[in-house]
């Protein structure tokens, strides 16, 4: 499944991106709040509905108020819910009360985990998917947690896997170098993603060694595939 991103400040630019990927045969769209613009819930919903009308594809919403400075509120969800194309949401607010609200009040919108350190809670509340950057270089651990919880329903084992993954999640989310860690993780997995773009700088040698150690301890199976750059 190919999902095309439509993130842009102006609605016109998001529409252009949406129609372009629709013409390329993409299966769905990822629709965010326009960054920096700080729209009201009504303005934000009108933006999403305009993108929907232009492309007419299934849409995954992406709620990340920490980066976008605006929440996809209940008013917003009520407005966009008038279109059946809005079928899922990647929830990255970190607010567990929003997870409860989505599960209880919007059962027609599939929940996708967008906050790694809450993955277990998301699965317990009915999320069946997890959009996570760390899976690019450590897919074994991420798939194991998803399968254990979502497919097998074994939350006792799921808690053990989650506990083993938490050091990696802390490294990615709390170290202030999320993108750099993802890129280096891909590089040591044999999937070079290039250096981070300015103004971001690459990890230091100590930071690289720290990430390697976290992966090694968390996921020995994954680590056997790593090819450490010289």
Q: Model-predicted segments: where are they?
A:
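Active-site beta->alpha loop and helix N-cap motifs at the rims of alpha/beta catalytic domains
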Residues: 1-69
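Alpha-helical structural signal in soluble globular domains
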Residues: 20, 24, 50-55, 76-83, ...
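Conserved short secondary-structure transition element at the edge of the structured enzyme core
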Residues: 126, 165-198
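Catalytic alpha/beta core domains of metabolic enzymes, predominantly
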Residues: 67-163, 172
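Flexible C-terminal active-site loop/helix
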Residues: 191-223
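Conserved small/polar residues in nucleotide/adenosyl-binding loops
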Residues: 224-230
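Conserved, mostly hydrophobic/aromatic
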Residues: 21, 51, 89, 122, ...
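A non-catalytic, amphipathic alpha-helix used as a structural packing/dimerization or gating element
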Residues: 157-168, 206, 210-213
């Amino acid at each position: 499944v190919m999902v095309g991103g439509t993130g842009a400040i102006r609605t016109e630019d998001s529409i252009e991106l949406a129609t372009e990927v629709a013409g390329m045969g993409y299966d769905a769209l990822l629709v965010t709040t326009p960054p920096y613009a700080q729209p009201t819930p009504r303005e934000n919903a009108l933006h999403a509905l305009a993108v929907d009308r232009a492309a007419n594809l299934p849409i995954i919403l992406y709620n990340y108020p920490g980066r976008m400075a605006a929440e996809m509120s209940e008013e917003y969800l009520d407005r966009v819910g008038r279109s059946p194309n809005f079928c899922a949401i990647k929830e990255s607010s970190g607010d567990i009360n929003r997870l409860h609200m989505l599960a209880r009040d919007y059962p027609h919108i599939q929940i996708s985990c967008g906050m790694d350190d809450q993955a277990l809670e998301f699965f317990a509340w009915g999320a069946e998917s997890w959009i996570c950057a760390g899976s690019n270089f450590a897919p074994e651990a991420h798939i194991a947690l998803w399968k254990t919880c979502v497919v097998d329903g074994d939350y006792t084992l799921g808690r053990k896997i989650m506990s083993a993954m938490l050091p990696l999640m802390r490294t990615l989310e709390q170290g202030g170098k999320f993108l750099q860690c993802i890129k280096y993780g891909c590089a040591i997995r044999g999937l070079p993603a290039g250096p981070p773009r300015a103004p971001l700088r690459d990890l230091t040698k100590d930071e690289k060694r720290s990430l390697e150690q976290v992966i090694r301890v968390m996921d020995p199976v994954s680590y056997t595939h790593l090819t450490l750059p010289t």
